[in-house]
Amino acid sequence: MTVILPDFLKSNVLVVGDIMLDRYWYGSTNKISFESPVPVVEINNVIDIPGGAANVAMNIASLGGRVRLIGLVGVDDAAQRLKKRLTECKIKWNFISVDTHPTIMKLRVMSRNQQMIRLDFEKKFNNVNTDQLMNVIKVYLPQYKVLALSDYAKGTLDCVEEIIKIARFFKIPIIIDPKGVQFSKYKGATILTPNMSEFEAIVGFCSNEEIIIKRAKELMNEYDLLALLITRSDQGMTLLQRSLDPLYFSAQSKEVYDVTGAGDTVVGVLSAALSLGENLEKSCFLANAAAGSVVEKSGTSTVNVAEINNVVQKYEYTKIPTGIVDRGLLKYVVSVVRGRGEKIVMTNGVFDILHYGHISYLMDAKKLGHRLIVAVNSDKSTRRLKGKHRPINVLERRMFVLSALSMVDWVVSFDEDNPIQLILEISPDFLVKGGDYNVNNIVGGKEVLRQGGQVCVLKFQEDCSSSSIIDTMEINEIN
């Protein structure tokens, strides 16, 4: 299956946050200063690149999306250079000029592909009156599908609680790249995207995955967050949601050249995809692919659709196990394919004597999504359900036959009377049964609907069932 990228030209995001100018001085280094034992860099090129929240906007614009940037700047040359560059990239901007502060600028001196030194020119915008900023946000926010907040702790988002309140009023998803240890100010946001260091600064050191998951869910519950996307350097990313198992996205870069601005790229692509109605899993998958591309570039950079597509299609062909699996492996492989944006279909039954009705039903079920899980009653479960003379075929044979079908991705068994616990663990996008079931009476149906999935009843061949086949065989034996 090939991953289809969304039409990023239709993405629609408002970006608010700390705006910076990233200035790069490039030069050659061939001698040591006589004044002090430091290298002398002969500058031969100067490049100015929008950074911080402006880099988030640049990444969205690089995809062809519609984006507006709002933030605080000084009254200076750096602000003018930002305005010129953003306008060239077709980014709409609303800058609130503060004459008591300079535009934040980070100057990096580069030589021989190495950063020699970084010099920061800044005065945090703390205690600056944000009334004008809030008024501009109130005007433009209803025109956009997603709000991306880029917090570098420079003061622009000191009013973040009020911004979140307004966005929630308009039911607009809020994606925040956070900073600092006061995550309480982000209460009510949709998604936070901390890196691992930022996450552990809040919850404490996490020695294993179990602790990460536990503390992440505690954090989400405490601050009313829908999800956390933790960026983990060479370990990729982990998406954690309150009621679902974590999703892991492996790092996609072949070689990490420069991580500058990678977090901006993640927020930009994630926000753009969500603004197009993509689900959270696929949006994170695309953001992870974008991050894998941007860290292979030097300096503050952006990605385009072709670069994301190149990473995505290579990632798509990563092999994952199929066939007969246990519950632990099933949860893992479902996590992997969900990270690719694939939809999960799940059905269950005894499947004692496989027949035409089963095959046609499973073919129709597979058409609903990308992956089909068949949960099979164990022998003990079947006897409790069908009687002491069933099953005709033992579990191993039933699962083997099902796993050989091209439309079936995974076969898993359950020993309980019904698969409710398994359904809750997997949380399929589609729960399917065949026959004359009422949706309200399907085991796990209400739970799947509550988690945003769908419950489907497919037409079953009336003259085909294992029981009727067995009955016919018994009649023929009598005759």
UniProtKB/Swiss-Prot annotation:
Keywords: ATP-binding, Carbohydrate metabolism, Kinase, Multifunctional enzyme, Nucleotide-binding, Nucleotidyltransferase, Transferase. One of its GO terms (cellular component) is cytosol. Residues 1-319 are annotated as: Ribokinase. Pfam families: CTP_transf_like (PF01467), PfkB (PF00294). It is an enzyme of class 2 (transferase). The active site is at 264. Its EC number is 2.7.1.167, 2.7.7.70. It catalyses: D-glycero-beta-D-manno-heptose 7-phosphate + ATP = D-glycero-beta-D-manno-heptose 1,7-bisphosphate + ADP + H(+); D-glycero-beta-D-manno-heptose 1-phosphate + ATP + H(+) = ADP-D-glycero-beta-D-manno-heptose + diphosphate. Residues 346-479 are annotated as: Cytidylyltransferase. The keyword Thylakoid does not apply. GO terms for molecular function: ATP binding; heptose 7-phosphate kinase activity; heptose-1-phosphate adenylyltransferase activity; phosphotransferase activity, alcohol group as acceptor. GO terms for biological process: ADP-L-glycero-beta-D-manno-heptose biosynthetic process. The keyword Ubl conjugation does not apply. Pathway: Nucleotide-sugar biosynthesis; ADP-L-glycero-beta-D-manno-heptose biosynthesis; ADP-L-glycero-beta-D-manno-heptose from D-glycero-beta-D-manno-heptose 7-phosphate: step 1/4; Nucleotide-sugar biosynthesis; ADP-L-glycero-beta-D-manno-heptose biosynthesis; ADP-L-glycero-beta-D-manno-heptose from D-glycero-beta-D-manno-heptose 7-phosphate: step 3/4. ATP binds at residues 195-198. Homodimer. Catalyzes the ADP transfer from ATP to D-glycero-beta-D-manno-heptose 1-phosphate, yielding ADP-D-glycero-beta-D-manno-heptose. In the N-terminal section; belongs to the carbohydrate kinase PfkB family. In the C-terminal section; belongs to the cytidylyltransferase family. This is Bifunctional protein HldE. It comes from Blochmanniella floridana.
